[in-house]
A protein has these predicted regions:
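Transmembrane beta-strand segments of Gram-negative outer membrane beta-barrel proteins
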Residues: 29-43, 61-81
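Short Pro/Gly-enriched beta-strand edge/turn motifs at strand-loop
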Residues: 130-134
């Protein structure tokens, strides 16, 4: 069993599976509070009860006595994904990519003569990483994700201080698809979760108009990924050209001279293809305790107007877990061919290639990961006795990803 640190390429694959910051934003604050979610989370200046622990802990001063809160949220990730290629699409002169090309085996051209146009790779079901099982679980097509939340708060009679804690999920998102889905190279199964299981909080009423508050979140962070791998780049395209053009006359006539001159790359049973499946990678990483904090201010000069601000800190982590990679035959054959030639062995050493590519490999893995900081400010204004307007502006430091 090997132990490695996750390289930037693998990290990029994980985050590309999350479809950039847009997908992350979709999962942010999805399962914290129903009322806040229905208002687009524009509640920084409008106290959402115990859930103010997350949105603005200063608003906890609005609670009187003992209060509990239990909620259940259902979410369905019915996400549409479309893929297309630009005009002139090719990799080292090849464009017969079966993902976007209709050409069958009867067409011998290396250039696609009939592109498919837009290719759909829709999400088919919700996937979640289950901590106890330490693996991802598919909920099945059409079954929504269920996210329960619970909290308790207490403000002693006559006191200016409020104490609270809650359990909620500030970030939870996951999706999956069956084999053959066009989106599987961006993640066949992806799960990104942050569950806050304890959040001791305190709020203080400075005066009738001003309150301040703080909370400390103790969270569980997990990332799960299963993705097909392929690398449609110029190097792989060149290797295909060598296999199909240069090596063809020597496939059945190998000798030591051709092995030395051609680096052993013709001694393969299957050549590299930029559009072929390179393998499949599975990852499961987690951290049981990831602390962060929230700081909030609430100013209510009148009953009709209020202003609130909240800062939610980042959380830097070293996620640890396991990986498993199933390698396709082509990369195994490439390394096997290079190792059959003395010049191929020299080239492999220069390029840092391994001496062998096993059919599968697994081991321990670690990854530096940062949950991004977030700042939000908002106002609440009662236009009429029965009409209220909430307006919030937020910023999330997704560049940390």
């Amino acid at each position: 069993m090997y132990k490695i640190r996750l390289r930037p390429l693998a990290a990029a694959i994980i985050l590309s599976g999350c479809s950039s910051a847009t997908f992350a934003q979709l999962g942010q604050n999805l399962s914290v509070d129903i009322r806040s979610l229905s208002m687009g989370n524009a509640v920084t200046a409008d106290p959402p009860g115990i859930s103010a622990i997350h949105f603005n802990p200063a608003a906890l001063t609005k609670i009187e006595g003992l209060q509990t809160d239990v909620q259940g949220i259902l979410a369905n990730f019915d996400i549409k994904r479309e893929f297309s290629v630009p005009a002139g699409y090719n990799v080292f002169g090849y464009s017969d990519d079966p993902m976007v090309c209709n050409d069958g085996p009867e067409v011998s051209s290396d250039l696609c003569t009939d592109f498919k146009g837009t290719v759909n790779g829709d999400v088919e079901y919700v996937s979640l990483y289950v901590p106890i099982l330490k693996k991802m679980v598919d909920l099945g097509e059409g079954i929504p994700m269920a996210a329960p939340t619970a909290g308790i708060a207490y403000k002693p009679p006559g006191s200016k201080m409020t104490f609270a804690t809650a359990m909620y999920a500030p970030l939870v998102a996951g999706f999956g698809a069956e084999n053959g889905n066009a989106g599987n190279y961006m993640g066949q199964q992806v799960a990104l979760e942050r569950i806050t299981y304890l959040s001791p909080s305190i709020a203080y009423e400075v005066n009738d108009a001003l309150s301040i508050g703080a909370s400390v979140g103790m969270s569980y962070q997990a990332i799960g990924l299963k993705t097909d791998l392929r690398f449609p780049n110029e190097l792989i395209g060149m290797l295909r050209m060598i296999d199909e053009v240069v090596c063809t006359p020597f496939k059945e006539n190998q000798d030591i001279i051709t092995d030395i001159l051609l680096l052993g790359m013709c001694n393969t049973e299957e050549g590299m293809n930029p559009f072929g499946r390179f393998g499949q990678m599975q990852l499961a990483l987690e951290q049981s305790l990831s602390p962060s904090y929230n700081l909030g201010v609430l100013w209510e000069p009148t009953e009709d107007f209020s202003f609130g601000m909240v800062y939610q800190s980042s959380a830097k982590m070293r996620l640890k877990g396991k990986y498993h990679i199933d390698n396709a035959k082509a990369p195994q054959e490439l390394i096997k061919g290079l190792m059959s030639s003395p010049t191929g062995q020299i080239l492999a050493a220069i390029l840092g290639f391994p001496s062998v590519v096993p059919a599968s490999e697994s081991g321990l893995v670690s990854m530096d990961f940062e949950y991004p900081a977030h700042f939000q400010a908002g106002v609440k204004y009662k236009v009429l006795p029965d009409l209220q307007v909430n307006f919030d502006v937020g910023w999330t430091d997704y560049k940390a990803w």
